[in-house]
Design a protein with these regions (language model features):
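Short, extreme N-terminal segment that most often corresponds to the first beta-strand
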Residues: 1-45, 175-179
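Charged interaction segments
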Residues: 50-179
């Protein structure tokens, strides 16, 4: 079970000088068990809480990069300036939205992520004025029947172009060798 999503486009950056407060904002999430969807639920047991797909104690994650990578943002890394740049996401949803909302005040203005769900639903995260907005959207496909072609005709056209290129190249080489 679960709902799979992937980022179609992502450009989210946390500036170097804001990494520490952003990481602290993530650690502060740990104090509110009501936000956590993961946990253990045995009768007569002490109930344990954690965020989906995350360790129970977020402080075991060493820094913001570790947090975001554990959340599922692959290839999250530092750029040459030392800013943290989020990588792509392609997995089940967990609670990424809460973590990114928590660090929104520290995310570079104008950052965004465009998401596509397994049911072809689109939405966008936009970061402005220290907030993350979730914006639903839809994609429309436009077909161009007047530009239609057959695969075989396209293959032949490509072969003709390659033959013409080869002939031109052979002529040029012959001229160069006679010079």
């Amino acid at each position: 079970m679960g709902y799979y999503v992937n980022t179609e486009d992502i450009n989210i950056t946390v500036p170097k000088d804001l990494l520490a407060p952003a990481y602290q904002a993530v650690l502060d999430l740990n104090e509110n068990d009501d936000l956590k969807r993961g946990g253990s639920y045995g009768p007569g047991e002490k109930r344990e809480h954690w965020f989906s797909w995350m360790p129970q104690d977020l402080s075991t994650l060493t820094d913001l990069q570790d947090v975001l990578t554990t959340l599922g943002f692959e290839d999250t890394d530092y750029n040459e300036a030392g800013d943290l740049v989020l990588g792509s996401y392609n997995n089940k949803t967990g609670q990424e939205d809460l973590f990114l909302d928590a660090i929104a005040p520290f995310v570079q203005e104008g950052s965004y992520a465009i998401w596509k769900g397994e049911d072809d639903t689109y939405y966008k995260w936009e970061f402005n004025d220290g907030k993350m907005l979730v914006i639903p959207g839809e994609v429309e496909v436009t077909w161009f029947p007047d530009k239609a072609y057959s695969a075989m005709d396209d293959w032949r056209r490509t072969q003709e172009m390659m033959a013409e290129f080869s002939a031109t190249y052979a002529t040029k080489n012959k001229e160069d060798s006679n010079a």
